[in-house]
C-alpha cells in the first residue's frame, strides 16, 4: 500500500516537474507566433549614416579611378617603373574629402598671404564615409594639429624627416584600394608567380567601369564641346561632375597613368591631349580658377565649371580651394617638370 502510494507520489511529482517545461514550451511557441508582428532588430546608427552618405557620392572615389587607369586590364598590376602614383593618390584623398564637404581651407583672411599649397586646411565634418582610406584620413586629421595641404600629402606619403610623425604615413594604399574595388565587383583576386614569389594581382572583372572613366577623361581633353555622360557609376545628380573629371585628368597625369586612358587615340591626338592637360593643370592649380575658353578643345568648359561653382554658397568655395591647392602641389612633381 505504502509502495503504491509512493509510486503514485513519484508519478505525480514527475507530472508536476514536467508541467513548467510544457508551460515554457507553450510560452515559447506563442512568443514565436507573435514574433513576426512586433519584432525588433538591433542596428548601428552609423551604418545608416554611411549608407545615406554613399548614396550622394559616386560609386568610385577619385583614388580608385586613378588606380583603375593605372592597372593593366588582364595582368592586374601597376607598372613596376611607376614611382609617381603613390604620392598622387595621397593628394586624391584630400581632394575627395574636399568634394565630400569634409575638408576645407581654414577661414582666415590672412591665408592669402601664403602660397596656395601652404595654406592650412581644417576638418569640418568628422562623420565616417565607409571608405577605409578616407575614414583613416579623417581620424588622423581630426586628432592632429592644423597643417597645410603640402604637409598632409608629404606626411601621408611618408616623406618626412621628423621621426615623431612617421605614424602619419598611410600604408598599403594601392593594395587597400584594389581590395575595395574587389569588394565593389570591379576587380577580382588572383595570384601570379614573379620569379620566386607569388604576388597578388587584381585583373579587371568589369571593364565597363574603366571604359566610362576613360571616356570622361578623353572628352575633357579632346572634345570641342565637353559632354559627360550619365552612368550608374557617375550619375547626373552628383555635384561637381565636370570639376571632378578635370581633377581626375590632372591626377592621372601627375600619377603617370594618363597615357592608359588615351591608348585608343592616334599619336597626334595623344600629344594634343597631353598639351591640354598641361593647360588644365596650370589653370586649375590657382585660386580662383583661371577659366578661359579654348579655341580648339573644351570650349564650354568655363561655362560648365562656372555653373557648378555658382550653385554653392560662398563659404563652400573653401572646399574647392583645397582642390586647387592639391593640383598646385602636383605641378611641382618631378615627373611633370
From Swiss-Prot:
Gene3D superfamilies: yeast vps74-n-term truncation variant domain like. GO terms for cellular component: cytosol; Golgi apparatus; Golgi cisterna; Golgi cisterna membrane; Golgi membrane; nucleus; trans-Golgi network. Its main location: Golgi. InterPro entries: GPP34-like, GPP34-like_sf. The modification Phosphoserine is found at residue 15. One of its GO terms (biological process) is retrograde vesicle-mediated transport, Golgi to endoplasmic reticulum. It is found in: Golgi apparatus, Golgi stack membrane. Homotetramer. Phosphatidylinositol-4-phosphate-binding protein that links Golgi membranes to the cytoskeleton and may participate in the tensile force required for vesicle budding from the Golgi. Thereby, may play a role in Golgi membrane trafficking and could indirectly give its flattened shape to the Golgi apparatus. May also bind to the coatomer to regulate Golgi membrane trafficking. May play a role in anterograde transport from the Golgi to the plasma membrane and regulate secretion. Belongs to the GOLPH3/VPS74 family. This is Vacuolar protein sorting-associated protein 74. It comes from Schizosaccharomyces pombe (strain 972 / ATCC 24843). The lineage of its organism: Eukaryota, Fungi, Dikarya, Ascomycota, Taphrinomycotina.
Amino acid at each position: 500500500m505504502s509502495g503504491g502510494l509512493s509510486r503514485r507520489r513519484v508519478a505525480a511529482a514527475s507530472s508536476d516537474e514536467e508541467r513548467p517545461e510544457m508551460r515554457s514550451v507553450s510560452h515559447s511557441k506563442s512568443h514565436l507566433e507573435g514574433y513576426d508582428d512586433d519584432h525588433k532588430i538591433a542596428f548601428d546608427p552609423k551604418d545608416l549614416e554611411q549608407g545615406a552618405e554613399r548614396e550622394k557620392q559616386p560609386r568610385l572615389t577619385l583614388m580608385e579611378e586613378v588606380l583603375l587607369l593605372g592597372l593593366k586590364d588582364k595582368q592586374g598590376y601597376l607598372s613596376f617603373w611607376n614611382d609617381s602614383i603613390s604620392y598622387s593618390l595621397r593628394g586624391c584623398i584630400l581632394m575627395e574629402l574636399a568634394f565630400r564637404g569634409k575638408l576645407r581651407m581654414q577661414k582666415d583672411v590672412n591665408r592669402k598671404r601664403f602660397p596656395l599649397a601652404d595654406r592650412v586646411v581644417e576638418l569640418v565634418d568628422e562623420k565616417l564615409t565607409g571608405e577605409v582610406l578616407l575614414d583613416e584620413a579623417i581620424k588622423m586629421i581630426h586628432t592632429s594639429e592644423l597643417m597645410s595641404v603640402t604637409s598632409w600629402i608629404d606626411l601621408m606619403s611618408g616623406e618626412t624627416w621628423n621621426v615623431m610623425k612617421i605614424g602619419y604615413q598611410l600604408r598599403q594604399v594601392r593594395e587597400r584600394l584594389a581590395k575595395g574595388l574587389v569588394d565593389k565587383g570591379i576587380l577580382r583576386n588572383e595570384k601570379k608567380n614573379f620569379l620566386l614569389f607569388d604576388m597578388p594581382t587584381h585583373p579587371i572583372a568589369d571593364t565597363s567601369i574603366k571604359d566610362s572613366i576613360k571616356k570622361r577623361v578623353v572628352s575633357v581633353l579632346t572634345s570641342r564641346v565637353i559632354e559627360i555622360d550619365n552612368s550608374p557609376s557617375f550619375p547626373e545628380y552628383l555635384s561637381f561632375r565636370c570639376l571632378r573629371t578635370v581633377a581626375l585628368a590632372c591626377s592621372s597625369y601627375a600619377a603617370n597613368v594618363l597615357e592608359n586612358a588615351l591608348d585608343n587615340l592616334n599619336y597626334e591626338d595623344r600629344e594634343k591631349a597631353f598639351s591640354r592637360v598641361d593647360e588644365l593643370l596650370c589653370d586649375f592649380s590657382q585660386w580662383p580658377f583661371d577659366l578661359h575658353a579654348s579655341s580648339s578643345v573644351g570650349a564650354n568648359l568655363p561655362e560648365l565649371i562656372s555653373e557648378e561653382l555658382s550653385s554653392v554658397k560662398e563659404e563652400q568655395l573653401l572646399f574647392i580651394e583645397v582642390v586647387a591647392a592639391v593640383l598646385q602641389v602636383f605641378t611641382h612633381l618631378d615627373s611633370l617638370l
